[in-house]
Amino acid sequence: MLLHFDIVIQLLSSHTLKSHQVEPPMDFETSFEEFVEDKRFIALEVSDNDDDCDTDLTADTADELESSAILKMRESDASLNVTTGNNTSRKTTSNSKKRWSLLSNHSAVSSSKSKKRWSVLSSSFTSESHKDRESRNVLQQKRKSLQSYSSLDTVASNSSISASSSLKRSSTGLSLRQLFTKIGINDDISQPGIGIPQGKENLPPTMGKKNSSIASTSSENRLRTPLKPLVNHSKRPTSQPQQQQPLYNASLSSRRSSISSTVSSSSSSKWRFWKRNKNQTPALLQPDHHSLKTFPAVNRRDSMTPVEPRNMVKHKTSFSDFHKTIFSSNTYSESSDTISSMEITLKNKASSSSLSLNVLKKRNSQSSLKHKSSHASLQKFKRNKGKSSMIAPSTATNSSNDDSCSYSSKNSTLSHRISLPVPDQVSRDKIQNKLRYSTSLLSLNSKSSLPMNKNDHDETLLRQILLNCDIKRILNPAKGDVLPLINDVNHLSSIQLTSNVWQIGEVICKKVSLGTIDDITWDRKFLSLQELEKLKIMQQKFDGIPQLLKSFVVKEANGGLYLYLLFKDHGTPISLISLKNWKQILKIFWSCAGIIHGLEKNLKFEHRNLTLDNILIDGNGNITIIDFKCSRLQTPQDDVLYLRLDHPLFFLNGKDKSKINEYQYQFEFEIYQSMRILLNMDASAFEPMTNLYWLYYLSRVLLKFGDRKLGKNDANRDKMARVINHLEMNLAVHKRGGQLFKRLETEDIKNTGDLLKLYK
């Protein structure tokens, strides 16, 4: 609704003349339409055009805003100026129109009606309001009103008046009262020194007449910086000079009232719209220090810390946008001085997380350089450091002190050393146990190997072999030497059984290569020597051992040396025969157990490779165990003959899968692994449980072959099954997923003797 400017002047003049008369508060529940019909309020059109947002405003010098919120006014071509001397409004050109940017409350216009309302635009109050205020009910809620010119004069004269002498809150209606209650004090930007005469920036205007007795709730440090009015350049004539009057806005806050009560008292305030100038620098960034001293805001702790505006209002084209901006950040802090100082500190201080990350990226710990003792590692580290410094120069600069030790350590005595791993105690024990009885040249603890020349060591082994042979010299057929038991047999009738075994009539010839005399083949010679020694020892008084007929060394035409071992024919390996019945299977098993028990009891013997190929059976059903290269026994001189568990002979069967099925192949290496776990890689130790492992292997394989060819309905088959179950309970060699179970507690079978006692 657009009103002519003369009506506005008339209403304001009448309100000024009657400003000293205190009228009773009006009913809060009177409808808003009632006052619209009576025209007892001032309301001007608010344009939605952006060009109209720059309306110029020159407000009254004494008009004050309460601590809840401040809205700025717009002004058209003519501006209304009110003098401070006589408290009267100055009239400008009658053709000009003034536009206000929000509905205000009713002016104090004289009327014959009984109820009147105080306007938010009231410019002054007299001291009589204080008297009428004291005469009214003390229990009513007290509100702070806007300060008039006299209140500003009171502030300038440092008069101490109680804050309880404010007028009651009056409103035009419930809707406006709720609206103004929600609005908080949030100025966009303080405009220090706007409209203040030169030389009087720090002094508020004084009254020429008597001072008002209305209590002032704020002192000099509670005044806020004035806001710069915006000018509507599109409608204002450029030739018309604009006269500016000092504009002061007092920021009032009560120490006793809470934040909610302070905000709720906004209904008795004077609301205006304003718009920040695009080309103007915010007040916080301007070097205007005297404005902060002149218009400090008082926080809840009465400190002189200036209140920093928390809501930067940008260009708003409508009241709804401005309303949302005001309400979006309407928050108060009970300790604004502490909070403001903390905010400044936090802005200047980096977070701990980012600081720690930056430090870790830029620095290298000195402890990481302790292991870089070799010269090559330091040079590599230096090159990497140089590359990283090219990528991030600041990083290299910050870490130069930390990395100085890495560059200086080049010239130290540690720079030419090579850092080697240090084994723990468990690894040391394993290495010592492995090397204690090792026959290799690298082992100094071995009794069979001494520090000597390699050729001398090879010749020593060859002499020992000849000493254990039946013929103590090397036979050379090229020179006419006759080979015993072989020259008498036609070689055309020989049958090759394996790669190094032939059957010549009733004689089994095993041919083992020893290499040439000049070659260092100590491993072959050593294995041949051990096998020959074991056979010599076992043939003295034990059954089930192959009978060695002759042994000698032959030098063939190619210059190679071969050890010939001639045995009696003891039958065929059980892997190549067809089993007849379960009784035969059970006899094979117990015969092997008896042979091993005799050797175990007298020689502390362990076969350690009792496969089906190493068990022979003749036409009479007699069982013979062969191939003792991998076995372990103790000589009468208490020497231990054994082969280390990591020797390739334990893995030879994997290369010849054609002779064994997949089940047998996998089961063999499960037993190998079980032995390594049981012996803890100490192959020289005597552990009779290894014989039980292989007997368990033999029983399982025979049971599988019997089930496939003979069926399961047999009493001897049940006996074999009970033995297998008993061995499983004691050996725990059954596995799932390739790993052995923990050994059970019921260990009633510890050797082959215990097994024979249970099933005698």
From Swiss-Prot:
GO annotations of cellular component type: cytoplasm; nucleus
E.C. number(s) listed in UniProt: 2.7.11.1
Keyword Kinase: yes
Residue numbers binding ATP: I474, L475, N476, P477, A478, K479, G480, D481, V482, K510
Species, as recorded: Saccharomyces cerevisiae (strain ATCC 204508 / S288c) (Baker's yeast)
GO terms (BP aspect): DNA damage response; intracellular signal transduction; mitotic cell cycle; mitotic morphogenesis checkpoint signaling
Domain of life: Eukaryota
Enzyme class: transferase
Domain notes from UniProt: The KEN and D (destructive) boxes are required for the cell cycle-controlled ALK1 degradation by the anaphase promoting complex (APC) pathway. The protein kinase domain is predicted to be catalytically inactive. However, weak kinase activity was experimentally demonstrated.
InterPro entries per the UniProt record, alphabetical: GSG2_C, Kinase-like_dom_sf
Composition skew (Polar residues), residue ranges: 78-95, 209-220, 237-250
Function: Serine/threonine haspin-like protein kinase involved in cell cycle regulation.
Protein name, per record: Serine/threonine-protein kinase Haspin homolog ALK1
Transmembrane segments: none
Modification type Phosphoserine: residues: S76, S79
Induction description: Absent in G1-arrested cells and accumulates in G2-M.
The UniProt record lists the keyword Nucleotide-binding: yes
Record keywords, A-Z: ATP-binding, Cell cycle, DNA damage, Kinase, Nucleotide-binding, Phosphoprotein, Serine/threonine-protein kinase, Transferase
Residue window of motif KEN box: 200-202
Biased composition range(s): Low complexity: 251-264, 398-408
Annotated Protein kinase domain residues: 468-760
Note: Present with 2190 molecules/cell in log phase SD medium.
Spans annotated as Disordered: 76-100, 123-153, 187-264, 362-408
